[in-house]
């Protein structure tokens, strides 16, 4: 959540002003629950996850209402750039070197890393992982179990994350949603 807060608030303040920043911060605080210090790992995770859902599901309509669909596209572009900054570094440099010698090896490494990065979002299985394709099967998306989360799916899963992995990791990401289940297919970019 620190990533979301450190990226979202500056975006809102830059494009909408300090008053809008205070307004979204107030909205977030109204829905956030404290993480129980004496709770189990699972309890802490569930509260933190619900807090992230609250943060994410409120920012998209907030931006859309004040900036329109073009503003939402600007926000999405800024989020992609923030993800690229967060996930850059020496490992990405090494991945680029590997890709120069073997696209399929680099893809396999990236697909495994994407699986690791996405595991906190929702439970899934990986029924297929080859040097040219990875399939992530989500039988019941945890995000969509919460009310008013269509934008997280539509903007985040269908647009922001695919742009990010294409630009930073040279991987195409396609989502195929059926109700609350989804199949994500990763392939090396051409």
What is the meaning of each model-derived region?
Residues 167-168:
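Conserved glycine-/histidine-rich ATP-lid loop and adjacent helix of the Bergerat-fold HATPase_c
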């Amino acid at each position: 959540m620190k990533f979301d807060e450190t990226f979202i608030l500056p975006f809102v303040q830059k494009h909408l002003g300090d008053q809008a920043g205070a307004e979204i911060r107030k909205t977030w605080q109204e829905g956030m629950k404290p993480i129980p210090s004496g709770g189990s790992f699972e309890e802490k995770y569930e509260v933190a996850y619900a807090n992230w859902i609250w943060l994410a599901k409120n920012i998209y309509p907030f931006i859309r209402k004040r900036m329109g669909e073009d503003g939402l596209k600007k926000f999405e572009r800024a989020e992609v750039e923030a993800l690229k900054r967060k996930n850059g570094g020496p490992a990405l440099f090494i991945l680029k070197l590997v890709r120069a010698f073997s696209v399929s090896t680099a893809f396999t490494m990236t697909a495994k890393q994407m699986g690791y990065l996405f595991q906190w979002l929702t439970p899934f299985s990986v029924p297929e992982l080859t040097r040219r394709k990875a399939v992530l099967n989500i039988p019941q998306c945890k995000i969509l179990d919460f009310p008013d989360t269509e934008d997280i799916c539509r903007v985040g899963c269908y647009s922001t994350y695919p742009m990010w992995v294409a630009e930073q990791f040279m991987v195409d990401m396609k989502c195929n949603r059926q109700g609350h289940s989804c199949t994500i297919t990763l392939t090396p970019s051409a």
